[in-house]
Amino acid sequence: MDIDASPQVHANQADDVFLIVGDKSKLQTFEERLQLNYDKGERYFEDKAVPDATIDDIDMDFVKEYTDEIDYGKSPLEYLKENRGFIKEKDGEIQISTAAILLFGKNPQNFFPRARIRFIRYEGTEEKFGTEMNVIKDVIFEGTLLNMINEAIAYLDTQVKEKTYLGSDGTFVTDAEYPKFVRQELIVNAVTHRAYSITGTDIQIKMFDDHIVVESPGKLPGLVRADNIRFTHFSRNPKIAEFLKNYKFVKEFGEGVNRMCNELEQVGLKDLVYHTNAFMLQAVIYNSNVGKTIVEKTAYSLIKLAVAVNKSLIDYQKPAIGEEKSAIDDKKSAVDKYVFIE
């Protein structure tokens, strides 16, 4: 018997909460129950007060930049106090929320050391360990969420291969191995929707020869599942999501995954794949080399080169005596039939 997931956390008369795992029910600890509340949106970790944080830990100059961006007329401090509960007063003390530190903090990693992005480049198509470790780049991005996103996107752009070829119209065309929007959206989604309550690990971008994996702490939130993620939206961190929306990383909530899938389809790449591995969500995209052997890749490159050379020669070929221009056009048409999508 299949039981649909509930959008709420339910407790029995003894106030115990159980999670169905396979055909068994597992009693949840206090921490596991709290994480369920965060995942289902009954509570938001971004609203949690940060111990020992004070107003001096907030970069008011950056808050001013943001309020200018959204045309907010009052002071930065008034914005933090009067909007979204970034700062609250309780029992005569000022409480600084997690969202305030992550978005506007002078040094968010002082309070959340693993709230960062780590880029790892591997040689080959799989992750190896020990004496076979194949890491060739390892770069960490820190700061506010906006700073991390901008730096990670810019760095990933430098790692993506580009190919230039002669198009059917006779002009040179340059394509990246992964669409730019897809690369950007994977990073934005990871930062926006990660479970910041899971403090022991960071967001990781793992780049291989034939695919990229973006790992983000936390499972799919709410009722979002791998089979409905393309058209279902749920925000684990609504304040963070709204902040990033105001910086126009995406036009509207919920359109990003669908657009990523569409762009991958348009360039002939495999579908975006999501996996849940323990407490980590993995998003995987593949480039055109996936599944090809070394021999196939070499042969493919040689054929492409031959076609490009032949096309160039035909373009500059003059009709021989007695040869009609239509014969040259027929040759061009034959070469144009070789359309390559890596």
Outline where the language-model segments fall.
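Divalent-cation
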Residues: M1-F18
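Flexible glycine-/small-residue-rich
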Residues: I3-A5, K106, R121, M207, ...
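ATP phosphate-binding glycine-rich loop and adjacent ATP-lid/helix-beta elements
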Residues: F181, D227-L269
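ATP-lid-like helix-loop hinge signature
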Residues: R194-S216
